[in-house]
Curated annotation (Swiss-Prot):
GO terms for molecular function: methionyl-tRNA formyltransferase activity. Attaches a formyl group to the free amino group of methionyl-tRNA(fMet). The formyl group appears to play a dual role in the initiator identity of N-formylmethionyl-tRNA by promoting its recognition by IF2 and preventing the misappropriation of this tRNA by the elongation apparatus. This is Methionyl-tRNA formyltransferase. GO terms for cellular component: cytosol. Residues 307-326 are annotated as: Disordered. The gene is fmt. HAMAP family: Formyl_trans. It comes from Symbiobacterium thermophilum (strain DSM 24528 / JCM 14929 / IAM 14863 / T).
Length: 326
């Protein structure tokens, strides 16, 4: 079996590492991002990939810059046949891509060339895509520009959240990776150049992406809310401060002339309706700042909103990176 050098950081990558190990592939080394401070205490937290590697007694490398010649030389000494890269978090130099004689294979959570870049899962939902998928790709020095090896398509349901799609794509991606490694080992792995048409970029999520702008159409806000569930969440500002909205539905606006961001109805046993730039959102689950998530009806019962309450965009929130985020 091929000897694998694995590079990855978050849980999405850990799923692929587990799959390789369960399939019996010898993983000669694991490269992941350095431990990062997390939580209020700032305690260093290992990446999910590091946790899997340590649990299996694998050598772990955490260079701050993989481009350094001495790091590349150290990894070459492991004697890997193929490098597998899944959400590692650093751009790889040509020297790093050539550590293994058979090259480097990447697992990317989109149907390339659509959604090249750092946040393809959330960007696909935010754009209202009804289909995405996973590609395995022969890596080159560009950002997700290499030849595609294998592809698997995955539908995006109208209620699918970012977390649900992440988990499904991680599972599908791990299966596709195993098939890709088998094809590489057999010598018949495809190399399909990406088309020049249809290229889009999935920019890294920034704090501004979390802000709910009620002047936008309700459909766009709905996609934003579900794309950012369960992390990092979408925010607005109300009379009681910042409010995170976790679940909502697009509904007709019962008060078409209302200013966007205005509560226009309280809906018994369901929540409250907020006017948007086009249509309205029936808010079903919220989280006041510093409190636990709750259904919107409980928030209404506690006096959180009433008809006429105004929400406005908050300043872009500061947040901690997700576990394993590069």
């Amino acid at each position: 079996m091929l000897k694998i050098l694995f590079m990855g950081t978050p849980e999405f990558a850990a799923v692929s590492l587990r799959a390789l190990l369960e399939a019996g592939y010898p993983v000669v080394g694991v490269v992941t991002q350095p431990d990062k401070p997390a939580g209020r205490g700032g305690k260093l937290r290992p990446s999910p990939v590091k946790e899997v590697a340590l649990a299996h007694g694998l050598p772990v490398f955490q260079p701050r810059r993989l481009r350094r010649p001495e790091v590349v030389a150290q990894l070459k000494e492991l004697g890997s046949d193929l490098t597998v890269v899944v959400a590692y978090g650093q751009i790889l130099s040509r020297e790093a891509l050539e550590i293994s004689p058979l090259g480097s294979i990447n697992v990317h959570a989109s149907l390339l060339p659509r959604w090249r870049g750092a946040a393809p899962i959330q960007r696909a939902i935010m754009a209202g895509d009804v289909e995405t998928g996973v590609c395995t790709m022969w890596m080159d020095e560009g950002m997700d520009t290499g030849d595609v090896c294998l592809t698997a398509r995955v539908p995006i349901g109208p209620d699918t959240t970012g977390g649900e799609l992440h988990d499904e794509l991680a599972r599908v991606g791990a299966e596709l990776l195993l098939e890709t490694v088998r094809r590489v080992e057999a010598g018949d792995a495809p190399r399909i150049p990406q088309p020049a048409e249809g290229v889009t970029y999935a920019a890294k999520l920034e704090p501004a992406d979390e802000v709910i702008d009620w002047a936008r159409p309700a459909e766009e806000l709905y996609n934003q809310i579900r794309a950012l569930n369960p992390w990092p969440g979408a925010y607005t500002n109300g009379p009681r401060g910042r409010l995170k909205i976790w679940r909502a539905s697009v509904v007709p606006n019962p008060e078409p002339g209302a200013e966007p961001g205005t509560v226009v109805a309280l809906v018994r046993r369901e929540g409250f309706t907020v006017a948007a730039g086009d249509g309205a959102l029936l808010v079903r689950e919220v989280q006041p700042h510093g409190k636990a998530r709750m259904d919107a009806q409980s928030f209404v019962n506690g006096g959180g909103v009433q008809v006429g309450t105004r929400f406005s965009p908050p300043e872009a929130p500061q947040r901690e990176p997700a576990p394993g985020e590069a």
